[in-house]
C-alpha cells in the first residue's frame, strides 16, 4: 500500500490493517515519503485515533529497524519511560527512578531522548550529571550488566526516525511517534513501566505490548495529567501480565505513602532537575526534596515490581524508599557517571 492510498482510507475514518501499516511505516522510515505525506499521515491518524493494529504495525517496523543493545544478564531487565507531552515540566521522575530500581537489583535499560515537551529530557539530565551518552551499543550493554543501569539515547538507536524529525517539529503536536519510541526499547525489554499523556492510551498500549511479547507491562496516566504515577492524584493503570490486561486506579495511600501536592516539583532546566534529584537522594533539605523522594519511590516501586524483584507494587515502593534513604540510589548514579566516562575515555585513548 502506498501513502496516498493509506491517506485516502485514514481521512475516510477507516483503520489500516497491521500489514498496511507496516507497508506505510516502512516507507516513512526508509525515506520513501515526503514531509507533507508524513505530516498528513500523522495528523490523519491522530484525528481518527490510532487503532491497535496501526500501533502494532508501526511498532513492528520500528523494532525491525532499531540499532539494538545486547544485555548479557537479562534477569530483572526493565525500562521505565514516559511519552512526555504532559506539559507539567516536572523533574525527571522516570530517570531518577531508574537509579533506584538498579540499586534494588534490577537491570534497567533506560531509553529516552532530549527534551521534546518538558524543560529537561532524560538525556539533558544525564549529561548534566556527567554521564557519557555517546557510547556504542556494546558499551551501553556493559553499563547495564556492570552498574545495573545503562542509557540508550533514542536518536542513536532509531536512525530511521530521522525522516520524521522535520514534520514532527513543524507539526508541534503529539503524534503516533510519541508513543512508538517508548515501545521500541533497543535492548528488547519485555518488562516495562510506561507513562502516557492520555488515559485512553493505557489499555491499547498495554494490549499492543502484550501482543508483541511483553511479559509484565504497566501503562500509567494520572488524573492530574502526568505521564507518571502521581503523588497528588489517583493514577490509572493498565497492567498486562499472564496474557491479560487489568485496569485499576491507584493512590499513594494504596502504596503506603501519603498524598501531597506537586508544588516545587517543576523545574526550569536540567540543572534544576539534577539539583532536586540529588537533594531527594541525599539529605532532603527542602519540602520539595521530600516530595520528590516520595514521587520517585512510587515510580521506582513500579519498576521494581514489574522487573520481578517484588511480588507487589507496594513492596516495590517500600524497597525504593529504603534505597533512596540509605544513599544507595545516589551511589548508583555516581557509579554510572564513573563507569560510562571510563568507557568513553578508553575509547578516546585508542
UniProtKB/Swiss-Prot annotation:
Cofactor: Mg(2+)
Binding note for cofactor: Binds 2 magnesium ions per monomer.
Residues given in the record as 5-phospho-alpha-D-ribose 1-diphosphate binding sites: 82, 85-86, 92-95, 110-118, 122
Keyword terms of this UniProt record: Amino-acid biosynthesis, Aromatic amino acid biosynthesis, Glycosyltransferase, Magnesium, Metal-binding, Transferase, Tryptophan biosynthesis
Top-tier EC class: transferase
Binding site for Mg(2+) 2: 227-228
GO CC, one annotated term: cytosol
InterPro entries the record matches: Anthranilate_Pribosyl_Tfrase (IPR005940), Glycosyl_Trfase_fam3 (IPR000312), Glycosyl_Trfase_fam3_N_dom (IPR017459), Glycosyl_Trfase_fam3_N_dom_sf (IPR036320), Nuc_phospho_transferase (IPR035902)
Key word Transferase present: yes
Top-rank taxon: Bacteria
BP term (GO), one: L-tryptophan biosynthetic process
Positions with a binding annotation for anthranilate 2: 168
Pathway linked to the protein: Amino-acid biosynthesis; L-tryptophan biosynthesis; L-tryptophan from chorismate: step 2/5
The protein's assembly and partners: Homodimer.
Similarity comment: family membership: Belongs to the anthranilate phosphoribosyltransferase family.
Name by which UniProt lists this protein: Anthranilate phosphoribosyltransferase
